[in-house]
Amino acid sequence: MDKIIKEDALQIASSNYVDWRKLRGKTVLIAGANGYVPQFFVHGLLKRNEIRGDGIKVIALCRDRQKAEERFGAYFKREDFQLLQQDVCAPIDINRKPDFIIHAASPAGIKVTMEHPEEVFRANVTGCENLLKMAAENGARLLYMSSVDVYGMLDEKRWISEEDIGTLNHVGLRSIYAASKRAAETLCMCFEQKGADAVIVRPSQIMGPGIALHDERLHINMISQMMRGNQIVLKGDGTPRRSFIYITDAITGMLAVLTRADKGAIYNICTELGEATVRELAEKLAGLVKDRKIKIVYNMETRHSDPAVRRVVSTVCPRSQKLRGLGWESKVTFTRACQRMMQYYGLEV
């Protein structure tokens, strides 16, 4: 396992923001475990067993065994780890009762959404239904990993709270991801009547190691460009503001919600310290590269032609006030998050 990932797993396992007493000796099912973000639930929980002997049983549900071997091969012979290879949309049958379920199984990105909209929708909605049924039957708590995309198009405002809601074109292909996340959130509320205990998290853009360079995430696209050459090409003028959070802060925040939040609660997973414009992100990453100058190019021809769309998506910065009410605080600065990513991808810092 990479050094950066090992260090991040240790940070998660050592966090005081998680109520580890509730996880001690329990079974945690992680759906979509192969994904960039959910893999860190696996790493963090198993590292906790190593340093504190908490006896947490981790079941990693994923479709691709080869990818799972690459991510978790070192755990395959451990008694506290079980690989469950299957589609989350199929009925889930396991021989061990889960105490906690984390639903993080969902393709993400504009390209995959446009090419495979039904797969994206079903992973969120059908997958969530299957896991909610399991939660209700076993008296387990489910954490649904939603997205800040559910807020849709909001009038220009500085911060987004959990109570805000914007418009969303639910029949547009580009909106399938957000629409399916909204639908799954509604399912979580519906299943409360059947005894399901569900909590929802809405992460902002999560930065960290272990993301494939072909990923569509904004910061990964920039790093990929720098690895191929000496420039970053931005679509537009770089003025839209976004909220970024490092993986260790995101995972500890979500585990805090899993172990401390009230039933049915919804939390943004973000930090105001990670707010930056697209231009500021590009300048920060470019400035961390030593021994060569990275040029930032603004391609105005690719800017969205609709002024209304440009306006409503210019700021996507959720508030963390509610999450901080659980005792959580961000520990990784925006600069440090960028540095660790650059180190992971072999760019000099």
Regions found by a protein language model. Name each.
Residues 4, 82, 226-349:
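C-terminal substrate-binding subdomain of Rossmann-fold SDR/epimerase-dehydratase oxidoreductases
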Residues 150-152, 175-176, 199-217:
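Flexible, glycine-rich beta-alpha linker
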Residues 129-174:
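Conserved Rossmann-fold NAD(P)-dependent oxidoreductase catalytic core, especially the SDR/UDP-sugar
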Residues 121, 169, 173-182, 216-217, ...:
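Short-chain dehydrogenase/reductase
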Residues 100, 115-130, 171, 175, ...:
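Glycine-rich NAD(P)-binding loop of the Rossmann-fold in SDR/ketoreductase-type enzymes
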Residues 1-100:
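N-terminal Rossmann/SDR dinucleotide-binding element
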Residues 85-123:
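NAD(P)H-binding glycine-rich loop region in Rossmannoid oxidoreductase-like domains
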Residues 171-199, 227:
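Active-site Tyr-X1-5-Lys
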